Amino acid sequence: MHVGIFADIEGSFGIWRMRQCRMGTPEWQYGRECLTEDVNHVIKGAFDACADRVTVKDTHEVGFNCIIKKLDPRANYVGGHFIQPTFFGNVLNYDLVLYVAIHAASGTKGAFFPHTHYGIFSEVRLNGRPVCEADIYCAYLGEFGVPVGFVSGEDIAVEQAIKAIPWAKSVVVDKRKETYTSGEKSIKYLIEGRERLREVAAMAVREAASMKPLVVPGPLHFEAVFRTEELANKFNTWGFDQTGAMVCWNADNMIEGFEKFNKLTFFPKNIYPFRRPLAFLMRGFYRIKNTYFAPRPNPEGAASKA
């Protein structure tokens, strides 16, 4: 069995503030250590359950957040974003995906760093219903026959994801500062929480046969509400239907719908023909930058480095 571990960062154990997720900051370097520890425990869980192969796909921002030299060497690591299949790259040979450190949807009140796909949106709707990233990403993977069987993150993020994939296993992660800055109590929470990641990930892999690919039948109607009308005007270079700050598009399936979403978000029309070499160059640049030129970590009083 080939298990894919997709890694965001906001829902990691040890992280409690936004700048720990913002690339290039000393606080983010601490956040990377937190994420890497979480991912390593999920890798261990997958192999505990006799996975044949494990591939870690880094999905946050430019896609180079895990500290590669600290990852379990049994796993393959894929950083950066790809063109085909859009965003994630090759997903065809995964038997199961485990999604680590997710966050809540744009507009979720009281959530930690909520956003859907990118921070420019105040809400994203599919067929009239507000959706989180799990609704979109899991349905996209489902078009290729790949089920998502595990999620970890704060309570509301997990709750939103499980509505889309109720068969998935989950681990809830606390986002309060005091949880991670209270000495021995915090260290105990981190140890127990990450052991839970390992145990539940193993459970998901063992029960992979019961996990279903999420398929949302078309036709699909997307509505992306930008935070301002100015942002909508700036990003909508494709001439999608637009009313004020809301941009809409239709698709026959999630593959087409997600491709258009990425066009709107990441690829202005005049850049689109050059997307392949640009993606290749960006992967190389950020792999080097984030590996060799990262700042020293600032744990901001956390009880442990990760």
What are these regions (language model features)?
Residues L126-N236:
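Glycine-rich, Lys/Arg-enriched anion-binding loops that position phosphate/diphosphate groups
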Residues G193, V200-A306:
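C-terminal accessory domains and tails appended to enzymatic cores
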Residues P73-V151, W167-S170:
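Divalent-metal (Mg2+/Mn2+/Ca2+)-assisted nucleotide/phosphate chemistry catalytic cores
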Residues F6-A7, K57-D58, V97-I102, V151-S152, ...:
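Short beta-strand segments
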Residues R19-K44:
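Short catalytic helix/loop segments, enriched in acidic residues and glycine
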Residues M1-G4:
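Extreme N-terminal starter segment of soluble prokaryotic enzymes
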Residues E37-Y94:
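Glycine-rich nucleotide/cofactor/substrate-binding loop typically near the N-terminus or early
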Residues E10-G14:
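Short acidic, Gly/Ser-rich segments with clustered Asp/Glu that frequently serve as metal-coordination loops
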